[in-house]
Amino acid sequence: MGLVQEEGSGPVHGFRLSTVSASLPSETGTTHEPTGLDLAMKLHYLKAVYIYSAGTARDLTVMDVKAPLFSVFYQIPCIIGRFRRHESGRPYLKCNDCGTRFVESHCDLTVEEWLRVPDRSVDESLVYHQPVGPDLAFSPLLYIQMTRFSCGGLALGLSWAHIMGDPFSLSHFFNLWAQAFAGGKIYCPKTSVTERDFQNPTSTFKKPDSVKQVDLVGDLWVAPNNSKMTTFSFNLTVNDLKTHFPVNGDGEFEILTGIIWKCVATVRGESAPVTITVIRSDPKKLKPRAVRNGQMISSIHVDFSVAEASLEEIVKSIGEAKDERVVIDEIVDDVSDFIVYGANLTFVDMSEVDFYEAKVMGKSPESVYCNVQGIGDDGAVVVLPGVVEEERVVTVTLPVDEIEKVKWEMKKCGLITPLV
């Protein structure tokens, strides 16, 4: 019997919690040891929402959604594990321990009405989220929320502890669910630490600029903030971006990063960021896919005024990013706590994540949203693929007292329209 929980007075309500486990138990004593790079992500979470039309999902029952999870969890038992600590204090994962939480809810709107809102950050209300802790042995690493719209459409929202894996891992997990739902055979290989061959590691030891050590948080894994953060999102097309901001030889992500960095720098004035972090896919793209933290984490430092520099100069500096994963992996010890997202102004390229491969009844989602929970005070920008190949969804998380000023700078330069 699930737990019934009514929360809030908005259009999403009627929360009912239950547990989903693997189809078979794992071998007794199966554990997973997180790497230093995993532990650097300990205070961050990914929140993803897949929305399917009524025509696709009207006849899907709760059991239809739950059943494929049994085999996926058996293939990836760490996802439904629970953390413990070694005597040294270093966390480790006891695999296939207690399952995950499945949340059922209802929305009073239709899918069409829900998607009519231009700011897709509203989708975060379709994700049931709880941080890991304070009781590590009882804290799930994954929550799955199934929301039924009034028209019969369906949203599946995931709250994913980033210590388990990067956005590609989350997408891989959900694509496996879709394959199992369609009756296909699934297989997820295990990835050993020795298989992590990071490209262009830093040749000499230097404290990485892309991470920031924070005060110890104990067993409640929540990133500390001095500022109240807020989020908004907007859509654009690659063609419009390159037409209005022509920069020779550079991709849309670099151009977007340069524009938004310049806007934030203008707003922050004397405290304008001269160091940023860029997180994107590993150029080597480990295959076959596995659940891991393999995303490339780089820092860029400039010695000029970003607010006054040309877009070409800023974009050129982004091409000189230094991959810091090896050093991050080395410096993160057993007990210290760090943040990555928002340690500096952080730009995350998820445009290559294959979110729209998660087909139900042969149909791709109507919309997919993904963002990071636990962003530090310097803020973060996430670039997502749109439902149309040439479209991008840009999600911006900044301190409350900056967000409207940054929006205004984006309007002035022509990145967003006055309607946003």
UniProtKB/Swiss-Prot annotation:
Q: List the GO terms this entry assigns under cellular component, sorted alphabetically.
A: chloroplast thylakoid membrane
Q: List the expressing tissues.
A: Highly expressed in flowers. Expressed in leaves.
Q: Biological process GO annotation list?
A: cell wall organization; pollen development; very long-chain fatty acid biosynthetic process
Q: Which UniProt keywords apply?
A: Cell wall biogenesis/degradation
Its source organism is Arabidopsis thaliana (Mouse-ear cress)
Recorded superkingdom:
Eukaryota
Q: Does Cell membrane count among this protein's keywords?
A: no
Family statement: Belongs to the plant acyltransferase family.
Task: Please give the InterPro entries that the UniProt record associates with this protein.
Answer: CAT-like_dom_sf, Plant_Fungal_Acyltransferase
Q: What is the protein named?
A: Protein ECERIFERUM 26-like
Q: Which Pfam families does the entry link to?
A: Transferase
Q: Which gene encodes it?
A: CER26L
